[in-house]
Each structure stands twice: as structure tokens, then as C-alpha cells.
Amino acid sequence: MIQRYTMAAASAGAILTFALAVFASTTWSAWTGDVLIIGEYHDNAEHHLQQQNAVAAVQPKAVVFEMLTPEEAAQLTGVDRTPEAMVHATNGFHWSNIADYAGILAHSTVIIGAALPRDDMRAAFTSGAADTFGPQATRFGLTTPLAAAEQNTREAAQFDAHCAAMPREMMGGMVEAQRLRDATFARAMLDALDTYGAPVILITGNGHARTDWGVPVYLQSARPGLTVQSFGQGEAGVAPSGTFDTILTDAPAPEREDPCLAFSSEG
């Protein structure tokens, strides 16, 4: 079973609520372990700042990014570790707001990309995550079907996330694509651990960071005994959906348009 490290509340000055700890950014240097997963809302600048603070304080051997393909990450190998250089070097990359991660990239000694090609995502949608992942699918738990309750919950969440604009029966494929991404991020982290040593940090969305069905599940399946901690980041005192070892909620929420307006006949 994965061991989960919790920073001492006394040293962190933290308030413990429902066994979840809320920490200030100054406590990142107290963290020790093998793997640190830091979630985010992709458009929240304060979340990126927390991640930057974590990378600067922990000084991981490698940082895995959901937002980069392996090919894009390879292009950053010789780039000066300054935000300005990273903004320039990532211009034209596939992630639309990749420049927002320049500060995190600048503090990352080794940068690893884990984003999947669209063809792999389509394959998971049609043929399942296990077939697409390949020979290690059993090791990472992809050949084990989800419990019915979790499957239903996840399909409903995908339906809502897509603004009810896609047929409900397509959501099973969306869940498979999500499982493929989670397992792929986990594999990238284990490869980084084997190559560079601990600790390794993953920068990713909250949905992938959650401990009940995200990347930690696949790490546990593939390599029990890792010391892992997952941070979720909420906004304006509201926690993100799912379970995490630690939740940060003090970031303000940026102004956003309703993403479902594009699907509305009145929008």
C-alpha cells in the first residue's frame, strides 16, 4: 500500500480538518518522500505559483508535466532556466497557456512531458485503456474493471464536464481515455524515479491528482510502497472534487466565462 507522508501540523502551523491539511506555501521545504503530485485548475495563476514554490523548495530530481509531450519536453533540455527563456522556447507548443508554466519550468532541473498523442486517446476511447497502454496494463491495474458505482460516477462527471453536449453512452469511452492518461502519467513518474532518483513532482490537473481514482491509484498498483503525497488546489475556500492527501483552498478564483455557453443555442 502506498505510504502517505503528512507534514507535522505543529511545524507547518496548519489547521487539520477532516484529516486533510491546509498548508501555506512556506511549508513546501518540509516535504520529503518519493513522489509529490500537485493538482491545479489550469487557468489559475495562484495555483501555478504554488507549484513553482514547491519545485523551488523541494528541488526534485525531475518534474513531469501533463502539459508537455515528450517531444516538447526534449526541446527544453538546453534552454536557460529563466522564465523569459521558457516563454520563448515554448511558443507554439500544443498547450494553449503553456507560457503560464514558465516559472515552474525555470525551476525544473529535468523536464519530462507525459501528454499523449490524440491517436492514443482515440484508441482508448474505442478499444479501452488496457489495449492502448500495452504490455504493462495489468501491472498498472488497467485490466481490472472499475467498480460499478465508480464507473457510473465517473461517467456522470464526464457528462457534466462536457456540458451534456455529447451522448451519455459515449462517456464510458471518455472514462477509458482518462484512465489511460492517469496510468501514463504514473508510468512517466516511475521511469523518472528509476532514471533520476527521488523525489519526482507531477504538475497536473486536480482530476489526475485525486487519490480515489487518479494517478496515485496507478502508482499504487504498479509499485506498492512508494511514499506519495497528492495536493489538490481549490479556490476561494472551496475544495476541488475528489479526495487528496492535502488540500489548498486559499487561492482566489479568476473570472471565467461559462464554458457551456458555447454549447447553448442562446449563448
Where are each of the predicted segments found?
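Membrane-embedded segments
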Residues: 46, 50, 70-75
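Zymogen propeptides
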Residues: 26-59
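Generic beta-sheet signal
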Residues: 34-38, 61, 198-204
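C-terminal regions of proteins
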Residues: 184, 190-193, 201, 208-267
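Short internal beta-strands
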Residues: 62-68, 229-233
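N- or domain-start disorder-to-order transition segments that initiate the globular core
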Residues: 5, 15-34
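Active-site environment of divalent metal-dependent phosphoester hydrolases
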Residues: 44, 70-71, 209-212
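A substrate-binding/cap region within the structured catalytic cores of diverse enzymes
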Residues: 74-192
